C-alpha cells in the first residue's frame, strides 16, 4: 500500500495496514510546587497536538503530589476521549491515547456533539417548566460530554492538517476545511455553554418562572434550535443556499425575545423580570452562534456559486 504524506513524501506499507500510526511520545517534568491545573493545561495541549503517549514524571527525585495525580485522572476521565492511564504511581504516570485516527470521523463527532447540546437545551427547558433542580444539575454534567467531543475534534484536525492524505479519511475535503471546522466546533461548545448558564440560573434562584412565560421561552428555544438544525444541515451538505437561509431565519430571534419581554408588563418583581431577560439572552445567543456556523459554511462553499468560465 502506497500512502501520500503531504506533498513531498510517499509511505509504503503492507496492504493489510489500514491506518497510519505515527507513535509520538512526550514527557512532562513536574516540580512539587507546580499547580495541578498547570499540568492539566499542558496535558490538554499535548493531546491537541496529537501525541499518543504522554509520560508525567517528577523532577529531582520528588514525587507527584496526590492533588496533581487526582487532577490528571479527573481530566482524563472527563475530557480526553480515547485516553487511558496505563501507569500510575507517585513516581510517575503514563497516558496512552488508544483511539485510532480513523475510528470516528470529524463529521460523526460533530453530529454527536450537536445532539448532546440540543438535548441539554431541551432538558433545561423542561427543568424550567417543572422547576426541576435535579434535572438542571444533569444539564451541567452533560457539558463535559460536549467538551470531550470538542477536544477530540481539535486533536483530529491538528493531526490531519499535517498530512493532507488523511483529510478525506476523517471526512474533510481539504486543509481549508480545518479552520472552518475548528471555528464551528467552538461555536457548538458555546451553544452548550448557554444551556449550562440557564441551568445555573435555575439552580441559584430555586424559584419557578411564571408558567405562561416559560411556554413562550420554550417556543423561543425551539426556534433557536431549529436555526441550529438548518445551519448544521447546510454544513453536512456543504450547501451555500441552505446556509444563507439559516442566517436569514436567525434574525427573527430578536422579535421573539422582544415579544417575551414586552409581555412581562404585569410582573411587579424586578428580579423575576431580570431572570427572564437572562434566560432569553442565552437563547438568543444560541440562534446567533447557529448563524455564525452558517456564516462559516458560506465561506467554505462560496466557490460553488461562482460561474465557471
Where are these regions (language model features)?
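Cytosolic, long alpha-helical scaffolding segments
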Residues: 1-309
Amino acid at each position: 500500500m502506497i500512502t501520500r504524506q503531504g506533498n513531498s513524501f510517499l509511505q509504503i506499507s503492507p496492504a493489510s495496514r489500514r491506518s497510519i500510526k505515527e507513535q509520538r511520545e512526550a514527557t512532562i517534568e513536574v516540580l512539587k510546587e507546580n499547580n495541578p491545573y498547570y499540568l492539566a493545561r499542558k496535558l490538554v495541549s499535548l493531546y491537541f497536538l496529537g501525541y499518543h503517549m504522554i509520560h508525567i514524571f517528577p523532577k529531582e527525585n520528588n514525587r507527584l503530589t496526590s492533588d496533581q495525580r487526582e487532577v490528571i485522572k479527573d481530566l482524563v476521565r472527563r475530557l480526553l476521549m480515547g485516553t487511558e492511564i496505563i501507569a500510575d504511581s507517585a513516581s510517575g504516570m503514563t497516558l496512552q491515547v488508544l483511539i485510532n485516527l480513523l475510528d470516528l470521523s470529524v463529521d460523526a463527532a460533530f453530529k454527536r456533539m450537536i445532539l448532546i447540546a440540543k438535548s441539554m437545551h431541551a432538558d433545561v427547558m423542561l427543568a424550567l417548566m417543572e422547576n426541576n433542580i435535579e434535572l438542571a444539575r444533569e444539564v451541567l454534567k452533560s457539558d463535559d460530554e460536549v467538551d470531550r467531543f470538542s477536544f477530540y475534534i481539535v486533536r483530529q484536525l491538528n493531526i490531519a492538517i499535517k498530512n493532507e492524505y488523511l483529510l478525506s479519511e476523517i471526512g474533510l475535503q481539504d486543509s481549508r476545511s480545518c479552520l472552518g471546522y475548528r471555528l464551528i466546533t467552538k461555536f457548538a461548545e458555546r451553544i452548550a455553554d448557554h444551556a449550562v448558564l440557564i441551568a445555573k440560573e435555575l439552580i441559584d434562584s430555586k424559584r419557578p418562572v411564571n408558567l405562561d412565560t416559560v411556554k413562550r421561552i420554550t417556543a423561543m428555544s425551539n426556534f433557536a434550535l431549529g436555526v441550529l438544525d438548518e445551519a448544521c444541515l447546510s454544513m453536512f451538505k456543504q450547501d451555500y443556499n441552505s446556509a444563507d437561509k439559516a442566517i436569514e431565519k436567525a434574525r427573527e430571534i430578536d422579535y421573539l425575545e422582544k415579544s417575551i419581554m414586552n409581555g412581562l408588563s404585569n410582573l411587579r418583581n424586578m428580579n423575576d423580570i431580570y431572570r427572564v431577560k437572562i434566560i432569553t439572552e442565552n437563547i438568543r445567543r444560541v440562534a446567533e452562534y447557529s448563524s455564525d456556523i452558517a456564516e462559516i459554511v458560506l465561506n467554505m462553499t462560496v466557490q460553488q456559486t461562482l460561474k465557471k468560465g
